[in-house]
């Protein structure tokens, strides 16, 4: 599966996070995803910031089935065969700005089989790409808390307003992340058991439902507080779900 990702607010990273989550889910279903950015900007900084937020950085080169000139020619002749399975772009961003080839807007729309439009921040443009890594990570001292903050919102939902988009719930995200990591570390000491199919399936279903990460996180919160589920089962379920979330929830195992 080929995914073309472009900047989508919060200094590029929100769009790449969406592509990352889509890739993680695709791998779970047996696909082999490749995320690329054909128009990289500030590549070194982007890769560093992606690493901080546990986002697989996009590739910046790809051998396409045809050259840019051939693409333009094909679309000029009315051929509409998508090159990419999914395109990720900022809400309102013209599709032609996502590709380094001289094709018009209708043709560019047809290059991806499906487009995901990612909302930006309430106090800036959706396609803002100029935030520094430090500005991005002011949302939380823990980069994973920034990731969690973003996942609490649907990708089409505009983040909060003010000088620090999303700051309204960054503190609660830090606290919840710390709590979950401590719980996972404590659960790891209990006898292991098969993961809860009920909660695991609910998380997977939420991802399948238009990448509804907010609903998936609510399922995990419910599992954490479910007294009827043994601790060892909670551990296995959280560990499996974290392959989708990418929050490093098992980081503190062995510390408690």
Where are these regions (language model features)?
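Structural motif
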Residues: 11, 134-145, 167-170, 206-214, ...
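Short helix-capping/linker segments at secondary-structure and domain boundaries
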Residues: 27-33, 153-165, 227-233
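Helix-rich, typically C-terminal accessory recognition domains appended to large enzymatic cores
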Residues: 205-255
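N-terminal Rossmann-like or analogous alpha/beta NTP/dinucleotide-binding catalytic cores
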Residues: 1-130
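Short, histidine-centered active-site or binding-site loop motifs used for metal coordination
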Residues: 3-7, 150-154, 224
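Catalytic adenosine-cofactor/nucleotide-binding cores of aminoacyl-tRNA synthetases and other
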Residues: 75-201
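Short, well-structured alpha-helical interface segments that form or flank functional binding sites
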Residues: 17, 175, 215
């Amino acid at each position: 599966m080929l995914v073309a990702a472009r900047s989508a607010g919060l200094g590029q990273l929100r769009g790449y996070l969406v592509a990352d989550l889509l890739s993680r889910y695709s791998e779970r279903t047996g696909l082999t995803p490749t995320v690329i950015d054909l128009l990289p900007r500030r590549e070194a900084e982007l890769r560093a910031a992606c690493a901080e937020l546990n986002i697989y950085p996009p590739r910046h080169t790809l051998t396409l089935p045809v050259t840019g000139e051939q693409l333009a020619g094909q679309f000029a002749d009315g051929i509409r065969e998508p090159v990419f399975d999914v395109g990720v772009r900022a809400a309102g961003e013209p599709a032609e700005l996502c590709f380094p080839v001289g094709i018009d807007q209708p043709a560019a729309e047809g290059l991806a089989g499906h487009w995901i439009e990612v909302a930006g921040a309430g106090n800036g443009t959706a396609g803002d790409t100029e935030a520094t890594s430090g500005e991005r990570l002011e949302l939380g001292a823990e980069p994973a808390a920034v990731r969690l903050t973003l996942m609490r919102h649907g990708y089409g939902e505009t983040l909060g307003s003010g000088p620090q988009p999303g700051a309204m719930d960054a503190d609660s995200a830090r606290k919840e992340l710390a709590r979950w990591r401590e719980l996972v570390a404590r659960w790891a000491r209990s006898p292991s058991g098969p993961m809860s199919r009920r909660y695991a399936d609910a998380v997977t279903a939420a991802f399948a439902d238009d990448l509804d990460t907010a609903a998936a996180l609510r399922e995990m919160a419910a599992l954490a507080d479910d007294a009827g589920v043994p601790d060892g089962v909670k551990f296995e379920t959280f560990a499996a779900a974290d392959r989708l979330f990418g929050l490093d929830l098992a980081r503190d195992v062995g510390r408690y």
